[in-house]
UniProtKB/Swiss-Prot annotation:
It comes from the Eukaryota. One of its GO terms (molecular function) is protein kinase binding. This is Sodium/potassium-transporting ATPase subunit beta-1. Residues 191-306 are annotated as: immunoglobulin-like. The gene is ATP1B1. The keyword Disulfide bond applies. It is found in: Cell membrane; Apical cell membrane; Cell membrane, Sarcolemma. Belongs to the X(+)/potassium ATPases subunit beta family. The chain crosses the membrane at residues 35-62. It comes from Cavia porcellus.
């Protein structure tokens, strides 16, 4: 029995290192060198093929503009303050109840302050009235970075924070700031003023062919009587986004780009009642989706507590 164990142990040790044949794990040094060389060459070739494939693919992709944009969804419409569950609830007499909303708006608007738009090499004045889209050449590096239109805080009126640092929340007249999300090369097409839908829209706001209109209304029938009056503050006094701020050329060509903003103030919401509000952009190339609640529109619930 002991002799059998010794024999088994000896064969195991001999497999690891055979001193007679100079073999390690059943292979000589030359054999190990050949097999290692084979795998180095094999995996090196695989890595080369992979890297070559990636390089060829990268040659077809522009770092400035997506090659295919036909399936890019229309831009989303979002509001500031950005809040969870899109619910704003506060008590005007309690600053703590609306502090987070005010701080959110303040931080967002910091880049729109005059001090942040002083550099004339980057920013330019693009008129105080809406005008046609401002083309800035092709999507390439030949002209370097493209200039950006200035957007002045004063155009946001009561919601600019210049005269009321609570953005209306202290008085129970909350403001929200609306923006159209950035989509590379997107040029909004305002609706023509000849359909039944646009006639209804423009019955409550000024029409301009160079403004993409936005309207905020009660979402449900019971909300329409509770929303009260709605005031809009934007460039030129129009309720929408002026076209001269489009198209957007991307972070590489327009790193300091400022989206045009629209401020909306609800001046006499019914108190102690949750009012559901829908804000919606209207345009020929603005779409809506039940799967994406922010595509071209958004809902927000506001409750002003007494």
């Amino acid at each position: 029995m002991a002799r059998g164990k010794a024999k088994e142990e000896g064969s195991w040790k001999k497999f690891i290192w055979n001193s007679e044949k100079k073999e390690f794990l059943g292979r000589t040094g030359g054999s190990w060198f050949k097999i290692l060389l084979f795998y180095v060459i094999f995996y090196g070739c695989l890595a080369g093929i992979f890297i070559g494939t990636i390089q060829v693919m990268l040659l077809t992709i522009s770092e400035l503009k997506p090659t295919y944009q036909d399936r890019v969804a229309p831009p989303g419409l979002t509001q500031i303050p950005q809040i969870q569950k899109t619910e704003i609830s506060f008590r005007p007499a309690d600053p703590k109840s609306y502090e987070a909303y005010v701080l959110n708006i303040y931080r967002f608007l910091e880049k729109y302050k005059d001090a942040a738009q002083k550099d004339d090499m980057i920013f330019e004045d693009c008129s105080t009235v809406p005008s046609e889209p401002k083309e800035r050449g092709d999507f390439n590096h030949e002209r370097g970075e493209r200039k950006v239109c200035r957007f002045k805080l004063e155009w946001l009126g009561n919601c600019s924070g210049q005269n009321d640092d609570s953005y209306g929340y202290r008085d129970g007249k909350p403001c929200i700031i609306i923006k159209l999300n950035r989509v590379l090369g997107f040029k909004p097409k305002p609706p023509k003023n000849d359909s039944s839908e646009t006639v209804e829209i423009y019955s409550t706001m000024k029409y301009n062919p160079y403004v993409l209109p936005v309207q905020c209304t009660g979402k449900r029938e019971e909300d329409k009587d509770k929303i009260g009056s709605v005031e809009y503050f934007g460039l030129g006094g129009y309720a929408g986004f002026p076209l001269q701020y489009y198209p957007y050329y991307g972070k590489l060509l327009q790193p300091k780009y400022l989206q045009p903003l629209l401020a909306v103030q609800f001046t006499n919401l019914t108190t102690d009642t949750e009012v559901r509000i829908e804000c919606k952009a209207y345009g020929e190339n603005i779409g809506y989706s039940e799967k994406d609640r922010f595509q071209g529109r958004f809902d927000v619930k506001i409750e002003v507590k007494s």
